[in-house]
Amino acid sequence: MFSPANEAHFALHIDAVEHDFSVLEFTGVERLNQPYAIELTLVSERADIDSASLLHLPAWLEISPGGGLHGFITRFTQGESGRRLTRYQLRLSPQLGYLEYRTNQRIFQHQSVEQIISCVLRENAIHSDAWRFSLSADLGERRYCTQYDETDLHFIQRLCEEEGLHFHFEHSRQGHVLVFGDDQTSFPQLESIGFSQGSGMVADQPVVKRFSLTAATRPDRVSRRDYNFETPHLLLEAGARLESAPAQPALEDYDYPGGFSDRGRGRQLSQIQLERHRSHQLEARGEGDRPDLRSGHFLPLTGHLRDDWNDLWLLTEVHHHGKQPQALEESISSDTSAVDGFVQGYRNRFVATPWQAIWRPPLEHPKPRIAGSQSAVVTGPAGEEIHCDQHGRVKVQFHWDREAQADEHTSCWLRVASGWAGDRYGAIAIPRVGMEVLVSFLEGDPDQPLITGCLYHVEHVPPIELPAHKTRSSFKTLSSPGGEGYNELRIEDRKGAEQVYIHAQRDWDQRIEHDQRLHVGNERHEHTAANHYSEHLAELHRTVHGDRLTELKSSDHLSIAGNQHCRIGQSLLADVGREIHLASGRKIVIEAGMELTIKAGGSFIKLDPSGVTISGPTVRINSGGKPGQGTGASPRLPGDTAPADRSQAGSLLVPAQRQALMLGKPLCAICEEPGSDA
C-alpha cells in the first residue's frame, strides 16, 4: 500500500488522436534558459501505430491532478511487443525546441533584443499568446546584430545571456507559455513545502527529503574596456563591484572588448556580469517527491533545522522521474526493479539559488567568431554610384544575406582600411556601389565588420590587360556619375620601356609651396590645346645651349616695363613682310663699326670709312617732302593666371591627449565631442 505521496496516476493526453497509451515511466529535465525534454516510456495494446503521424502533435503529461507538463512530440519510437502490449518511447519538447533545427545567417538593425527575439519566434510559427516578456526596463536598441551560422535557438539563448535575460515555461493542459524576464519579479511562487529528513518513513504529503547548500568562490568585481572610433581618445572603461567586498583577495573579472560604445552601457553590462557571478555563488541541491516543482518558480521551504534556510528558493533546474509499473499487465522483457529501491511513484532532484540573488544565465552560448575574411558587394541607394558617410564608411551586402535588397539598408556602415590614415592626411579611396570588397571582422566579431580591400572578378576586370602587361602598375578612376571619363596614374616597369603615365580627365592642379626641380634626360614635348598662361613673380632665367626655334602662327606681343637688353654674338637677321616701325620718346641711335646702309626703292644712303654716299634719281635736301608714318606699337597684355586648387595640412594630436592615450588614462569626455578643438 503506497501513501498518497507515492501514489502515481500518470497519464498522457493527446487530444488530436485516439490512443490507449499508458505511461510506464518518464524522466525529464527542466532548466532555466533551456528547452525542457521529457522522455516517456508507454505501453499500448496496438502494435501498428504510425510513428510519423504522431510527430509534432501537442500532448499533456498529467503527473498530478491538474498538474503536469505540456509539450510537442518531437520523437516517437516503437519498441518490443509482448503477447498483448507493445512498448513505445516518445519525447515531449516545447515549441522553442524546434528552433534547434533551424539555422540562419542574417542581420538585424536598429532593433532591441525583445524585438529581435519576437521576430524569430513569429517566424517559427510560435503565436504571440505562447510567449510574453515580463521586463522591468526597456532593452536598448542594437544598431547592428548578426545571426551568423547559428540556430535560432542558440541565437535567442545567446542574446538572453548577453542581456542578462532569463526564460522559463508555464504549463497547462491547453499549452505552455514561454516567459522572458530580467529580474526576480517574473518568477511565480509555489505553495510552501516542508522538509523531512530522509529516515525511511513514508511521508503523508510530498516533502523535500534532502537539501544541501554549496558556497563557491566567485569574482567580486568586474571590469570591462572597449574602444569607439568616434571617440578614439576617450578611455571606454566601466566596472561593477560588491558594495561590501569580502575579506579575501580582490578577484577581478576583466575582459576586452566589452561590447559597448558608451560608459553607461558598459556599467550595465558589468553589473549584469557581476550578478551572473554572484547568482551562482550559493547553490542548493535537493530531492523530494512533490510533482509540481518547476524551474523558474520560487519554492518556499519550511521545517528545516537551519532556520535561515526556511526561505524562498529559486528553482533553476528540476529533474523529474516517475514510474508506474501497474501499466504493465504482462512482462515485455523489462525489469521494473531498481538498485536504489525506487520502483513506483514520483520523485525529483532540483537545483536552487537564494531569492535575493538576481539570477543571470551563465554564458554557455558564445557568439560565433568569423575566422579570416569574407567578400561582399558595396551597396547604396538606387541610382547612386558612390554612397558613403562623413567617415568614408560604406555599406555592403554579404553573399550569405538572403534578406537584404542591395540598397542602402543592407548593413551597418563599414569602415574602410587605408594604408595610411592621420588627422586630415593619409590615403583614401571610397569603394563604389557594385564593387566586390574584402571584409574582415574585429576580434572575429560578426557585428564589427570592416573593409580591408577590393577584389576584381570576371565582370570587373583590371584596368590593364593581363598577363600581357604584367609589368604595369596602375591607379585608375572612373568619372561619376555616368562614367566615360577617368583619371589614371600608370607605371610601366618593363625593361627598356619604363614609363610613368598620368591622365587627368579634366583639370590638373599643382601647388608647390617651395621649389620645383625638373630634369629631363632626353627630349621634352609639350602640347597645349588652348591658351597657356604663365606668371613669374620674380625673375625668369632660361639658358638654351643649342638653337632656339620658335614659330608664331599669329602675332607676338611683348610689353616691357623697364629696359630690354639684347646681345647677339654674330648676326641679327630679321625678315619682315610689310613694316618695321621703331619709335622712341627721345632718341634712336644706330651704330655700326664699319658700314651702315639704308636702302629703299632703288635709292640708298651708305656710311662707311670712305664717307657718306647718297644715291637716288633725285636727292632733295631741304626741298619739301614729308616723312613716312609708321603703324605704331600696341602690345596686348597677358591674361591673369588661374590659381591652383588648395588643400590644408592635417593636425597632430593635442599633446595632453597623446600622452593620455599612450598611458591608457581617461580623457575629458567633453573634449572628445565631435567638433571640439581640444
Descriptions of predicted regions:
Residues 1-678:
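Amphipathic alpha-helical and helix-coil boundary elements used as assembly
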